[in-house]
């Protein structure tokens, strides 16, 4: 959650009634931003104060004509958009903190998880780590017991296991935070047995 450096806003739970940019329509960012807004405030983000610009265009509006108050960005850390910023950016923008103890945060933490926005990821923007939120990613498939589906998903899981160390060493830095463990899923969801078998043997 990005706002102007001189904004009185400090926390995510203070964005109600702010002019938000939530990313392009039907994008993952727009879905996450509008879901989080609804969970925080029990209502949808007002259409009159919600825009659907790209991150780059929204930042121009944020710091230029100031027709946007908050730009919501959902990206793997470090997000290139922020990591590439010059030191002067610190005088123009800042990131909002997520207060997990605030009463409005309880519903959000049923869907999203706590995260740390690291100063090391954005040295030109942050002087200290900030509490934030993370979106968990899932690969979802129909529970087809067809041989082609079983074969494809088994090969995918096996390849992930075999190449996991390479992904962590040479892939996007976010891979270093990924674990191959099989955490408990929310009610109504279960692991696809062929994938579960492969991953279980991989981490054994």
Regions found by a protein language model. Give the residues of each.
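Segments of small-molecule ligand-sensing domains
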Residues: 126, 130-204
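Solvent-exposed coil/turn segments that connect beta secondary-structure elements
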Residues: 4-7, 25, 75-77, 98-101, ...
């Amino acid at each position: 959650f990005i706002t102007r450096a001189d904004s009185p806003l400090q926390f995510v739970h203070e964005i109600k009634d702010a002019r938000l940019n939530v990313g392009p329509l039907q994008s993952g960012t727009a879905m996450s931003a509008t879901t989080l807004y609804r969970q925080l405030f029990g209502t949808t983000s007002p259409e009159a104060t919600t825009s659907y610009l790209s991150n780059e265009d929204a930042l121009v509006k944020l710091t230029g004509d100031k027709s946007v108050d908050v730009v919501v960005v959902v990206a793997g850390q470090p997000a290139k958009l922020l990591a590439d910023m010059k030191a002067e950016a610190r005088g123009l923008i800042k990131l909002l903190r997520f207060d997990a103890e605030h009463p409005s945060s309880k519903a959000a933490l049923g869907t999203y998880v706590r995260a740390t926005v690291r100063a090391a990821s954005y040295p030109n923007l942050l002087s200290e780590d900030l509490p934030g939120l993370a979106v968990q990613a899932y690969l979802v498939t129909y529970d087809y017991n067809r041989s082609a589906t079983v074969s494809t998903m088994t090969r995918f899981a096996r390849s992930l296991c075999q190449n996991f160390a390479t992904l962590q060493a040479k892939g996007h830095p976010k891979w270093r935070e990924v674990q191959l463990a099989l955490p408990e899923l929310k009610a109504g969801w279960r692991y696809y047995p062929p994938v579960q078998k492969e991953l279980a043997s991989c981490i054994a």
